[in-house]
């Protein structure tokens, strides 16, 4: 723990720069630099997370595994990733995101390379489970950076734009693996992303930094004169800034701002079911199109890319609407988008007798649009309904539930599909989307103010 503390501990705050013109110039520079660095870095996390998914059809043909066996491999990643998101969230709230995010990315690159060197289910599960653990090092440091460098009054926009990194990464990896598989098989589709991510990890060490105060800049609330954190407790802006900049103990983070927060439990439970749908569509839709409509792998993977692109637009629209229409309250958009998701899944099932790829691509685009809105908003709402210094833990807590749910998109859903066919697959998705909608309803008016009043 001593070695961990020395290596990963956040840098100390330095004397605040007094020249306001210098402060303004430096804030502008570092906000842009940190944003594009963590944005691109998270795209690369997706390269090592989803490489196996799109190599799966070729791996089946090469090694003869069935869907349930491959589902086990997928479930090991989601299970270890889910636990890691919570544990890593606690660690990241007390760590330097510069090294935390970068080292995690490099280790995921190594696990992809070792996966490509293996041929047995046991080794596949081992490397993919280890990959899942270090995938959990990607998101919590981003939550920490987003809450320290961007004020609440603007955070919905910045958060939604950053969240499109999920979709860009998810859209690029099937195209990348599709071309690599054509030239060097599924093993090459594991090696190349792994090598790229090791290199990107070194770039992150160079580009990222921790809090504004570690660079001599004032806290973002002071710089932006953001009243949100102070006014809901009846404090002055300066008192509110001092309170939210106070470092919290692990006990305070867990038992004051996370585990006793009723809204986080609703969000976490909804996230469980949203992620079953998300990972099911992402992991199995290409195989669905190949088996039922006999599409070539490249065409099926392209349709899945449209799912990610739809999600990109969905997150941007959801973030903008929650800022402008519901005034920073994320609950209404979660409910409305979940309702749209239900109808989009129904449309995909009823189109199963049509073999036009553009119809399937459009429907996957619409599913992505309505699914990624609440998927993004859950993490944002969790961070805002807890505490600035507990943002990584709060988002990690909901992420823990999310990826525990995602494990059900692996072996359990693979078994459902083996036994009841694709009809059973779609019934499961509809059930999950319906439950998520019901869980979002109580959070319609959830805000920081009524979170504190119930504490």
UniProtKB/Swiss-Prot annotation:
Q: Which InterPro entries match?
A: MFS (IPR011701), MFS_dom (IPR020846), MFS_trans_sf (IPR036259), OPA_Antiporter (IPR051337), Sugar-P_transporter_CS (IPR021159), Sugar_P_transporter (IPR000849)
Do you know which CDD domains this protein is assigned to? MFS_UhpC (cd17488)
- Name the segments for region: Disordered: 219-242
Q: Where are the transmembrane segments?
A: 34-54, 70-90, 113-133, 161-181, 185-205, 257-277, 302-322, 331-351, 363-383, 394-414, 424-444
GO CC: one term? plasma membrane
Give compartment(s).
Answer: Cell membrane
Supply one GO BP term. Answer: phosphate ion transmembrane transport
**What is this protein identified as?**
Probable hexose phosphate transport protein
The way this protein sits in the membrane is described as:
Multi-pass membrane protein
- The answer on whether this UniProt entry bears the keyword Isomerase reads no
The family classification in the record reads: Belongs to the major facilitator superfamily. Organophosphate:Pi antiporter (OPA) (TC 2.A.1.4) family.
Q: What does this protein do?
A: Transport protein for sugar phosphate uptake.
Q: Which Gene Ontology MF annotations are present?
A: glucose 6-phosphate:phosphate antiporter activity
Signal peptide as annotated in the record: none
Q: Which UniProt keywords apply?
A: Cell membrane, Membrane, Sugar transport, Transmembrane, Transmembrane helix, Transport
């Amino acid at each position: 723990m001593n070695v961990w503390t020395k290596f990963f501990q956040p840098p100390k705050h330095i004397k605040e720069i007094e020249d306001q013109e210098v402060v303004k110039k430096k804030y502008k520079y570092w906000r842009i630099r940190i944003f594009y660095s963590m944005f691109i870095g998270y795209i690369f996390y997706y390269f090592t997370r989803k490489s196996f998914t799109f190599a799966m059809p070729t791996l089946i043909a090469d090694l003869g595994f069935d869907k349930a066996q491959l589902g086990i491999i997928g479930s090991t990643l989601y299970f270890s990733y889910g636990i890691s998101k919570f544990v890593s969230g606690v660690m990241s709230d007390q760590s330097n995101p510069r090294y935390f995010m970068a080292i995690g990315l490099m280790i995921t690159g190594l696990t992809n390379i070792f996966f490509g060197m293996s041929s047995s289910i046991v080794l596949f599960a081992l490397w993919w489970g280890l990959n899942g653990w270090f995938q959990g090092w990607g998101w919590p440091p981003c939550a920490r950076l987003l809450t320290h460098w961007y004020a609440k009054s603007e955070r919905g926009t910045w958060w939604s734009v950053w969240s499109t990194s999920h979709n860009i990464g998810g859209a690029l990896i099937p195209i990348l693996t599709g071309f690599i598989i054509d030239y060097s098989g599924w093993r090459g589709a594991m090696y190349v992303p792994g090598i790229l991510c090791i290199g990107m990890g070194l770039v992150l060490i160079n580009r990222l930094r921790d809090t504004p105060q570690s660079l001599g800049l004032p806290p973002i609330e002071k710089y932006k004169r953001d009243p949100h954190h102070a006014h809901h407790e009846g404090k002055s802006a300066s008192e509110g800034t001092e309170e939210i900049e106070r470092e919290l103990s692990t006990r305070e983070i867990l038992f004051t701002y996370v585990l006793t927060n009723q809204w986080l439990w609703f969000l976490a439970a909804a996230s469980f079911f949203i992620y079953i749908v998300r990972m099911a569509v992402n992991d199995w839709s290409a195989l669905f199109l190949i088996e039922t409509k006999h599409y070539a792998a490249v065409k099926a993977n392209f349709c899945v890319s449209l799912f990610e692109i739809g999600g990109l637009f969905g997150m941007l629209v959801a973030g903008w609407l929650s800022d402008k229409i519901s005034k920073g309250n994320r609950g209404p958009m979660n409910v409305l988008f979940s309702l749209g998701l239900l109808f989009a899944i129904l449309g995909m099932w009823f189109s199963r007798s049509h073999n036009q790829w553009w119809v399937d691509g459009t429907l996957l685009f619409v599913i992505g649009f309505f699914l990624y809105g609440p998927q993004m908003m859950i993490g944002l709402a969790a961070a805002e309904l807890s505490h600035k210094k507990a943002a990584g833990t709060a988002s990690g807590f909901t992420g823990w539930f999310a990826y525990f749910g995602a494990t059900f998109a692996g072996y359990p859903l693979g078994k459902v599909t083996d036994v009841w066919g694709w009809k059973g697959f779609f019934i499961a998705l509809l059930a999950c989307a319906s439950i998520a909608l019901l869980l979002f309803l109580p959070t319609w008016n959830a805000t920081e103010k009524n979170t504190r009043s119930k504490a």
